Amino acid sequence: MQIGTQAICNMLTGNMAGSKLVWKEWMRDADRGSVYSELLAINDDGVIMATMILILNCIRNSEELCQIMVNAKTGVAMLNSILNDLERLHSDEQNKNFELGYAIISQLIDYGHFTTIYKTIENTSDNKMNGRLTMLIKVLDSKIHAYKEGEVPDFLGHTELKKISGLVRQLCQRAIFVMNQVIEGQQQEQEISSVLEIDDVSEVYTALVLILQTSSTLLTLNDQGHTVFKEMLIEDDVLKSVTDLLTCCETMDQKKQPGFNYLKRDSVRLLGALCHEDRRMQDKIREIGGIPIILAQCKIEDANPCKYSIYLREYAILALRNILKDNHENQAIIAELEPKEAVQTDELTEMGLKAKLVNGEVKLEKA
């Protein structure tokens, strides 16, 4: 099979007319085209490599053939198989098959098909988050980070940006639901397993971290940020959704449920980006009670890995700066806060120091 696929690939390489004719026929005739999606599912890296090279050679630099692929039943089957392979190989990104699969998905995204692929795979997955959708988001996130610094990626049109904005809200709501179920712990084991499937929870968490990071990146591309995307986030009430997510994370016992730590870091970063030079968002986060939640992130938590805990604190300080800048109402909230106690940390004890609160200020003295 590998030799036969390679032979077809050799015949079509450099033959644009032949590639176009054959590709259209494969996409039109499900019986013929399905052969190649089935080859992608074979447990043989050589066969998979030859098949991916064939697919990439057919669609490379062809907007028309990419369009045909994402809309054809045969093409969708190929995409499912390719994304499955990417998921299987994601821990070995130097693998040649991973590179080929990435190149195919990347080519389709370049022609503006991210949303089409996402919706198609979602529809074939009972609208559940899964590894294929997560890998699709990972490819998009990787492409955005690899793009020229300070410039908006030209493969992100209105449809793609709107989809990303909607995913932030959708995945926040799903994650909050999951965390509430964990916190309450009131359902029977059978009910929990039916509602909170482990794989589903894992994929929601991974996808949400990615989509929060992607959104923050788009908002901080340059001094002005992505103004169109920001308005979409505002329209989707993402500030409220992310604040609710952060609030829910605060209620979790981080020592027992450490898996949600990264959500706090990326939530704070996005909230800070939304409030940057925007009086509407500054006022909104005050009105929904978000300022104390942001302030609470300035401490370093023992449950967090050290570097991520520090990053969380830095993002929280930056977010507070954006929230308080030229906003007297927000500044007044901070001014009204009074210190209650000085926390004695293990590090201070080891250094022989004791923290005391004197006239509202923290003082250190020898223990």
For each feature predicted by the language model, list its residue ranges.
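Elongated alpha-helical scaffolds that mediate protein-protein interactions in large eukaryotic proteins
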Residues: 1-37, 41-50, 57-77, 89-99, ...
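Sequence-level detector for tyrosine residue identity
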Residues: 36, 102, 111, 118, ...
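Short inter-helical turns and helix N-cap capping residues of alpha-solenoid HEAT/ARM repeat scaffolds
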Residues: 43-44, 90, 94, 204, ...
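Extended HEAT/HEAT-like alpha-solenoid repeat tracts in very large eukaryotic scaffold/adaptor proteins
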Residues: 1-8, 47, 51-55, 97-105, ...
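Long, compositionally biased, phosphorylation-prone intrinsically disordered terminal regions
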Residues: 40, 110, 145, 150, ...
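Amphipathic alpha-helical segments within extended alpha-helical solenoids and repeat-rich scaffolds
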Residues: 28-43, 73-89, 114-136, 153-195, ...
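Eukaryotic scaffolding regions of large macromolecular assemblies
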Residues: 208, 215-336, 345
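Eukaryote-biased recognition of C-terminal alpha-helical segments
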Residues: 43, 54, 315-322, 338-367
